[in-house]
Amino acid sequence: KIAKIREDFSYALIHDMKTPISSILMGIQILETGKLDTRPEKRAKLFHILKDESEHLLALTEKVLTLSKLENHQLNLFREMLSLRSMLDDLIEKFSAKADKPVHFSLALEAETVVADGEFLKEAISNLIDNAIKYSGASVAIIISSFCKPDGAVVIKVKDNGFGIPLKDQSRIFEKYERASATERSRKGGASGFGLGLNYVFRVAEAHGGTVEVESIEGEYSEFSLSLPQKEFLDSVEEK
């Protein structure tokens, strides 16, 4: 079974890397012909595409390396008090600018601050937003909320109006090689590939001593809840 999992993951990783590599190669071949030498606007647009695809490929390789370190507990987290609203405002600006379809964001933050590693938390939430956009129709509505649990943990929720996840797949979507019903969701306009992003969220939650859960109704919505403990860190600060 382990060998099969590794085989599936390797195949999926190659599949996900193939698209940006193909785009980069095709762009270079077009530039080599010299056809765009007298068309500066199209040439500039192609360079922009090449840059985006190169950054996508680099981000993918970095995510694989980070996942490996998280799995082996080799990554040290730098926990600090963060402004959740400020982090989300940055992400909303980023995704609103690059999305290829209308995306409406709503914030409902009862917890305005959170103790976490800012870099990893931001990337985890970014992955949840990215999935929400990929697996939704022509118009996307995303609600991001937060609140404090009685034990002090901060919960961050990301809810979309997308295609949803079949109940039979929900227990497997955080596995590194899994992307639930990718073929079916692709037919509905979703992304193809595999679920590195959700496994990353799972590993970041785990590294913080927290959890991530999903609630979804196929054809209606998906809501991911990221719970991050706060008490241990805050108690250690008070002791100092």
Regions found by a protein language model. Give the residues of each.
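Short alpha-helical segment of the dimerization/phosphotransfer core of two-component systems
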Residues: D52-L57
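Short beta-strand/loop element within the Bergerat-fold HATPase_c
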Residues: S139-G152
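Conserved micro-motifs of the catalytic ATP-binding
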Residues: N72-L77, T113-A116
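Short helix-loop "hinge" at the ATP-lid/N-box region of the Bergerat-fold HATPase_c
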Residues: A132-I133
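Short conserved segment of the HATPase_c
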Residues: I165-E178, A182
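A conserved beta-strand-to-alpha-helix junction within the catalytic ATP-binding
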Residues: F78-E93, K122
